[in-house]
Amino acid sequence: MDSLPTSQRAVVQSEDVGSFEISRGRPIPVPSSSQILIKVFAVALNHCDWKMPARVPCPGTVDGADYSGTIIALGDTAALTSGFKIGDRVAGAQMASQRRRPWVGAFTEYILEEADSAWLVPDSLSWEEAAAIGCAATSSVGMALWKSLNLPGTPQNPITEDGKYVLVYGGSSASGTFAIQLLRLSGYNVVTTCSPKNFGLVESYGAEKAFDYHSPTCGEDIRTYTGNTLEYALDIITEAKTIRHCYAAIGRGGGRYCGFELLPHDLIATMRRSVKAEWVNGLEMTGLEIDLPGGYYCKANPELHIWFADLIKQYSVLISQGKLRPHPIQINKGGLEKVIDGLGQMKRREISGKKMVYPLV
């Protein structure tokens, strides 16, 4: 700790809604007993990094979720119980955009993390690849699959029934390819949607069949392909059009739908009652109360954080075994200053089939 700089920089939300700026002179945090202090080596961008600040602005809060870096200090409990040590390479996700904890966010030089929320990076992964896995979207995927959709199969205990389908809408996204891999390991057949140019990409991660989301009959085509038996739909995109496509794809017996965004309840109210709809808010996995407006408020839920910590351990094993691999990455130079440019590119939908990663060291 003695050799650390006296201050650091961070990408924070500015006063202009949906905009960002570099904040300088920020203090280096000190870990509590259960925390580790990490020097950030690389960060990766998620759509939530620009969407949440636009929807629930919290000026001055640090932005960013996915990171990789090196442990440079541990709290007393973390040192005794986590299995980590100084110098370990770790990755994970910060649950940013929190009014009550404005310092939490990955787009900075040094971060605090709960020791049970980080995973050990194997030598087979680069800093950039580890950041691309992170855990922000990937943990939301886990929450969607096993909490909202309530799937019976897991990678550790896959289903044995043949021909059980799950739809991943938006399969060429980083969350999509991670979901496809988890579902295949859990024994499911995966159908997905993306642009035709990305059909090969999603198939390389395990999708059985890809459908063009531009097609007005996309949902009906999926329903036909799955023999009117589809029960589960995971919607990474979660817009009015994608919701309609997912509902159209689910078979006559109904099923479950899970979105990655706050659902438009007026639209859901007009849809089939035989489909149970939910959405996942990744901030819940902190286990803390999240004081945000507009449907994003979360009650404290320590049990969910315990579940999340166990999920991270399972991911860590699968990653070390090479059973889960990162999304294709696009490495961009320029550090934190260029992260702001990258967020603009994502907002303008200029990125497809790649995970934007920025080395900081």
UniProtKB/Swiss-Prot annotation:
NADP(+) binds at residues 48-51, 172-175, 195-198, 213, 260-261, 351-352. Keywords: NADP, Nucleotide-binding, Oxidoreductase, Virulence. It is an enzyme of class 1 (oxidoreductase). The keyword Nucleotide-binding applies. Pfam families: ADH_N (PF08240), ADH_zinc_N (PF00107). One of its GO terms (molecular function) is oxidoreductase activity, acting on NAD(P)H. Pathway: Mycotoxin biosynthesis. SUPFAM superfamilies: GroES-like, NAD(P)-binding Rossmann-fold domains. Its EC number is 1.-.-.-. Residues 15-357 form the Enoyl reductase (ER) domain. PANTHER family: HYPOTHETICAL OXIDOREDUCTASE (EUROFUNG) (PTHR45348), TRANS-ENOYL REDUCTASE STHE (PTHR45348:SF1). Trans-enoyl reductasee; part of the gene cluster that mediates the biosynthesis of GKK1032, fungal natural products containing a macrocyclic para-cyclophane connected to a decahydrofluorene ring system that show potent antitumor activities. Within the pathway, the PKS-NRPS gkaA, with the help of the trans-enoyl reductase gkaC, synthesize the polyketide-tyrosyl acyl thioester product which can be reductively off-loaded by the terminal reductase (R) domain in gkaA. Monomer. Belongs to the zinc-containing alcohol dehydrogenase family. This is Trans-enoyl reductase gkaC. It comes from Penicillium citrinum.
